[in-house]
Structures are given as C-alpha cells and as structure tokens.
Amino acid sequence: MELSNYRLGDLIFIPGLFDNKLLHKIINDYPDSFATKYIINQSKKYEDNLTAITNIVLDFIKNNKHLFPDDIQESTVIHLRLGDVIAGNTWHEKQKRPLDINDMKDILKNDMNKKYVIGKQFYCDTSSINYNECNLLSIKYLNEVLVSFNAFHLENTADIDLCCGVMAKQFFQGRGYFSKLIVEIRKKLNLPVIETLTTIE
C-alpha cells in the first residue's frame, strides 16, 4: 500500500508537525503542488496561513478552469475521507470514522443540486496496517454514497479536489483537516458550508 506525506490540511493547521526534512521531502515529491507553493511562499514572505493558501487556490482556479466540471459551481460537493479511517485501530482513525449514510441523507434531504464526491483512500506512516480491510470497506462505503445520492466521483489530485470543494455551490464537510481547509477557505470567501464536525478533526 502506497503511503503519502502529502497532508495539506495538516500543513496549514498544525505546521509544527513538519520539520525541515519533511518540508523538503514534500517539495521534492510534489514539486508543482499547492503544498510546495505554500512552503516556498511562506519562506519568502510570511502571510497568515489561510490567506496564503487561499490566494494559491484562487490563482490556480483562475488559470485552470478547463480542469473542472462545467457545472461545478451549481453542484454540491461531498468530501469523503477514505482509507485508514474506515477500519483503522488507532485513536485518531477511530475519531475520524465517516458519517453514517442515513445521517448524510437526512442532512442533505432538501439539497436538490447535482452531487459530486471528492476524496480517495489515504494512508500514512501512522496508519494501521489492516490495509486490505480498509480498502474493501472504503470501496463499499464510496459506492453506497454514490448510489444513495446519484453522485459522480471526481478522481483527481488532492489539489484539484480541493478546488472543486471551494468552487461548489455547496460543500458537505468530511473528516480531517483537508476537509476543514475547504470549509475555512469557503468561510473566508463567504460561501456556504454544511459543517458536520465540531471538535474532532
């Protein structure tokens, strides 16, 4: 199972987790990413974290509209955190279990927008090692969400997924700091969000 160190939400909200070695690894592994642009930007001229990443995202959207669905601004984007949190055994994985689909249906019962789903399976070096179980249950959960909401899964990079979440008419928050980042950018831009979390990130 491929492990990832591309944790953009963590980088913005809990930067103390990232030492210089890890920052350089992100730059080397993801040279054209939002994370790399953010790291370089902050090393040259420090800005408020949210302001810096918001400007990077908006600039990318402005110059790459061909990468997004034509109707993304008329749609609801649902973020799903998949992978280790589905069946992992660590405390942080258990805290980030996805919402029950019936609860999602209740929250979205009056939402008539077309639905897109963003998010893919994520594993890092602190994930539990029951990868096969997490993989199978992630696929099952994703498919159930897609069927329940007649939704389309956008299988893009994390950066493009983030842009879709920001551009959408409505955004449904999932688990983790990546989803929180989309929420906070949308709030900064005075865009609506469906928040599903309070203290658990």
Each predicted region: which residue ranges?
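Secretory-pathway luminal glycosyltransferase catalytic domains
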Residues: 1-114, 121-127
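Donor-binding and catalytic core of enzymes assembling or modifying cell-surface/extracellular glycoconjugates
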Residues: 113-200
